[in-house]
Amino acid sequence: MRDYVNWLRHASPYINAHRDCTFVVMLPGEGIEHPNFGNIVHDLVLLHSLGVRLVLVHGSRPQIEARLAARGLTPRFHQNLRITDVPTLECVIDAVGSLRLAIEARLSMDMAASPMQGARLRVVGGNFVTARPIGVVDGIDYLHTGEVRRIDRKGIGRQLDERAIVLLSPLGYSPTGEIFNLACEDVATRAAIDLKADKLLLFGAEPGLLDGQGTLIRELRPQQVAAHLERLGADYQGELLDAAAQACRAGVPRSHMVSYAEDGALLTELFTRDGGGTLVTQEQFEKLREATIEDVGGLLELIRPLEEQGILVRRSREVLEREIGQFSIVERDGLIIACAALYPIADSDAGELACLAVNPDYRHGGRGDELLERIEARARALGLKTLFVLTTRTAHWFRERGFQPSGVERLPAARASLYNYQRQSKVFEKAL
């Protein structure tokens, strides 16, 4: 119970932040076939109940493949896009129609079996996507395979205003009445861009983007994507990553890659600080900056446990407010996770590095080194020649970074007179 209460408390800022936001969610056909599909639907209904404006885009690739196989037809692709002749288009229409009904039925069933019962959740679809043929590429005619020409932004917006979930299928219609087979990733990306969505959420088989060693990459800038696309080649994660980057370049603040196979992956990504997938964003999710008076409360939360352990000298709120200009901080999505302060020492060309602290959950990301570099740069800018640090627990860390053992007698008089002999802090210094 305590874990649940703590989770809810930590999630509450995100619940408030996501209310009335527009999220475009892309779920491929593989995700619909997966045993976790029911949990994903439940989580989508939960998001809707929390005031999120939802547009759900579904895929249909494995379902199309099954219908082609049943009819003895061979799938044809070029550059990872299906070539859609008339028999294939018939399979596409059959698969998409069946999936729409299945998704609507599951959303309705989940509503009746959850606290949302009686909330009149509505799922709305329609001819919201106008398409055009891809045409001939490299001498290959794509026939009834198309690309998104336009999203009916106003029509979708009206349905979202009426608190409906909008369901978009990977089909588009031309002004002349033709039907085109579309890539669900393209539909989702264009919908997110044209609707000016707050988020694009892309489901895949993996937890997110993995590096060459299989480690999850938690955050990327769009300009970092090209190297990963080259490594991934035709892998489906590459398609998702490309879609995420395109959306961000076109103004969508954040795109997320999450797993359809992991129960709760969507909620973990949206309602925890570090998420569980890969975030692609132009925004600086974590930033190193100088502290302001508004940061005093967050600083107190960070340093208080270390003060209680005797690692840091205790500072009152009044002292922090008075000395806030000395602090540099690392802020991660609104939370202060690290800090350090520089105090120039009167009547000398030396300064003191003090109150270097990093949240225990973030102590292996090099943030202490970043803060040390920032403090040293600030000291040099002030014309200081020597940086002192007094510590009781972290002597080895500072020695590994160029600080040499020193003594109280080496401190400038203004600082030596304040030395606390009860703490018996060790003194180190570093020439700048």
UniProtKB/Swiss-Prot annotation:
Record EC number: 2.3.1.1
Pfam families (UniProt xref): AA_kinase, Acetyltransf_1
Gene3D superfamilies: 3.40.630.30, Acetylglutamate kinase-like
Gene Ontology MF annotations: L-glutamate N-acetyltransferase activity
Keyword annotations: Acyltransferase, Amino-acid biosynthesis, Arginine biosynthesis, Cytoplasm, Transferase
Source organism, top-level taxon: Bacteria
Annotated compartments: Cytoplasm
Known catalytic reactions: L-glutamate + acetyl-CoA = N-acetyl-L-glutamate + CoA + H(+)
InterPro entries: AceGlu_kinase-like_sf, Acyl_CoA_acyltransferase, Asp/Glu/Uridylate_kinase, GNAT_dom, NAGS_kin, NH2A_AcTrfase
SUPFAM superfamilies per the UniProt record, alphabetical: Acyl-CoA N-acyltransferases (Nat), Carbamate kinase-like
Pathway connected to this protein: Amino-acid biosynthesis; L-arginine biosynthesis; N(2)-acetyl-L-ornithine from L-glutamate: step 1/4
Any one GO biological process: L-arginine biosynthetic process
N-acetyltransferase domain span: 286-425
GO cellular component: cytoplasm
Catalytic EC class: transferase
Family (UniProt): Belongs to the acetyltransferase family. ArgA subfamily.
Source organism phylogeny: Bacteria, Pseudomonadati, Pseudomonadota, Gammaproteobacteria, Pseudomonadales
Protein name, as recorded: Amino-acid acetyltransferase
